[in-house]
Amino acid sequence: MWRPITEAQPNCLAHARVAIVNTGFNESEPSSQSMSGKRGDYTASIRCISEQNIVFFVMSGPSADEALRYLDQLYARFP
């Protein structure tokens, strides 16, 4: 999943952190473009590429249905 953005990189990463935590994932150390988190066997990642005005949302885990449910929640919680 992706969506267009117009915000600066630090703001996008801050929103990514809030979305990951508010979806119930434990955050990990961010990189210059990504924020990730774990929740059991599931991993969430949000990648901000502000210079190209885009943010990507990725979810992985053992159940495709559950991963999609988490992905929808993550996407909805990103401002």
Ranges and model annotations:
Residues 50-79:
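C-terminal basic regulatory modules in eukaryotic proteins
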Residues 7, 27-29, 51, 66:
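Glutamate identity and glutamate-enriched acidic tracts
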Residues 1-23:
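Terminal, regulation- and interaction-focused segments at domain boundaries
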Residues 44-48:
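Short, surface-exposed beta-strand/loop micro-motifs that present aromatic residues
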Residues 38-39, 49-51:
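Flexible, solvent-exposed short loops/turns enriched in glycine
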Residues 18, 23-43:
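A cross-family detector of function-defining hotspots
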